[in-house]
Amino acid sequence: MSAQESCLSLIKYFLFVFNLFFFVLGGLIFCFGTWILIDKTSFVSFVGLSFVPLQTWSKVLSVSGVLTMALALLGCVGALKELRCLLGLYFGMLLLLFATQITLGILISTQRVRLERRVQELVLRTIQSYRTNPDETAAEESWDYAQFQLRCCGWQSPRDWNKAQMLKANGSEELFVPCSCYNSTATNDSSGFDKLFLSQLSRLGPRAKLRQTADICALPAKAHIYREGCARSLQKWLHNNIISIVGICLGVGLLELGFMTLSIFLCRNLDHVYDRLARYR
């Protein structure tokens, strides 16, 4: 076996192994995009409610994952069977996917400020209309979950809940906040929380009934609640995840660029090897 044949054989199996890896990676990308679309319990869904293009990007991410899996399968078969038509198709579609992912990464990075502004607008609107419409609770439950996970209360501070008319105690000027603001680690006393929870619900009136999730209730502002707003934590979360998404897009793009180079090299040199083998027969 000549050096060129050994090199082509090495490239062939290299493409096969790494396309197998990218098949698994494409499955993970698809699952991540699908999770953003269907998950209604995390603050990722709250971000999606605030910025419609995020839902579009999630769908693009899911489709991108499916395309990555299909291309990886195409590359595996084309490299292993040494089929020029499949390798050429693999190169062309990989080039298209490369351009799409780079464009997606640039769009996400340039829309960060707009996304943060839209999130802030939705948060303040959700706080102001808290519990006013029992039929529309998706944003409220998502924000309760965000406060619980980020260990914060309100947007800038718990005083933001002054704007929520339904959480003001009847006949009292005392401020009430959702129980997602309650800092249970400050007291380590769940029994005190239960007593507080039951007594305050009765003061909020008939519309303050407990929903299906246990995260919805009310607490007086003097209780042990988180004193920091969620603005900084949520903006930091958005910033870190946007950087991660852009980094993944660029990293995968560079790998795809390398695979395109190897596939076109293998595709162009297969005929030369076969012609030489035919002369030796």
Curated annotation (Swiss-Prot):
Its main location: membrane. Residues 39-59, 112-241 are extracellular. Tyrosine phosphorylated; leading to activation of downstream signaling pathways. GO terms for cellular component: immunological synapse; plasma membrane. Keywords: Cell membrane, Glycoprotein, Membrane, Transmembrane, Transmembrane helix. B-lymphocytes. InterPro entries: Tetraspanin/Peripherin, Tetraspanin_animals, Tetraspanin_CS, Tetraspanin_EC2_sf. SUPFAM superfamilies: Tetraspanin (SSF48652). Glycans are attached at N170, N183, N188. It comes from the Eukaryota. It is found in: Cell membrane. Interacts with SCIMP. Interacts with SOCS3. Interacts with DECTIN1/CLEC7A. PANTHER family: LEUKOCYTE ANTIGEN CD37 (PTHR19282:SF263), TETRASPANIN (PTHR19282). Structural component of specialized membrane microdomains known as tetraspanin-enriched microdomains (TERMs), which act as platforms for receptor clustering and signaling. Participates thereby in diverse biological functions such as cell signal transduction, adhesion, migration and protein trafficking. Upon ligand binding, two signaling pathways are activated, one acting through phosphorylation by LYN leading to cell death or a survival pathway with activation of GSK3B. This is Leukocyte antigen CD37. It comes from Rattus norvegicus (Rat). The lineage of its organism: Eukaryota, Metazoa, Chordata, Craniata, Vertebrata.
